[in-house]
Amino acid sequence: MKQPDRNQQQGAKSNRPAINDEIRSKEVRLVGADGEQKGIVSLNEALRAAEEVELDLVEIVANAEPPVCKIMDYNKHLFDLKQKQKDAKKKQHQVQVKEIKLRPATDVGDYQVKLRAILKFLEEGNKVKITLRFRGREMAHQQLGLAQLQKIEADVTEYGVVEQAPKMEGRQMGMLLGPKKKK
């Protein structure tokens, strides 16, 4: 059975439901440990029924008339709630934007390494920002950079879609890829 928390101040209101002796109503609508409706009984009867099966009497709906109370193991109930929250948190995937930086003169071997990284990021469900930096006289050959970004776009069509078309931003050209929606 739930033991009173020694660290909790007496009379302090918390967001947890009333348990056992904390219930202030004279009569309660009792729900058994198996979920079966027991009807309206006195608080003492409900507490006795909970003690017989060595479980807690927990006030489920406090503002009902009379309040609805259920016989359950409160600590196990809290544990199950925390487990559900953890599982829900694990299932969530935070989409991140990963950045890959290239130059217009990037060689074939280096291009393949960057392409593998892009595909890995897209398979993980992340977005990929591809930045192509131009230095010095490379600015005169922006069409080479655009051709390289279009080649990347063609190579990743199976895994991702272009969310932002290639565009110049100062001395660099950028493009944003997003993962393809799974069916």
From Swiss-Prot:
InterPro entries: T_IF-3_C_sf, T_IF-3_N_sf, Translation_initiation_fac_3, Translation_initiation_fac_3_C, Translation_initiation_fac_3_N. Transmembrane segments: none annotated. It comes from the Bacteria. Residues 1-24 are annotated as: Disordered. Residues 1-13 have a biased composition (Polar residues). Pfam families: IF3_C, IF3_N. One of its GO terms (biological process) is ribosome disassembly. GO terms for molecular function: ribosome binding; translation initiation factor activity. It is found in: Cytoplasm. Gene3D superfamilies: Translation initiation factor 3 (IF-3), C-terminal domain, Translation initiation factor 3 (IF-3), N-terminal domain. GO terms for cellular component: cytosol; membrane. Keywords: Cytoplasm, Initiation factor, Protein biosynthesis. IF-3 binds to the 30S ribosomal subunit and shifts the equilibrium between 70S ribosomes and their 50S and 30S subunits in favor of the free subunits, thus enhancing the availability of 30S subunits on which protein synthesis initiation begins. Monomer. Belongs to the IF-3 family. NCBIfam families: infC. This is Translation initiation factor IF-3.
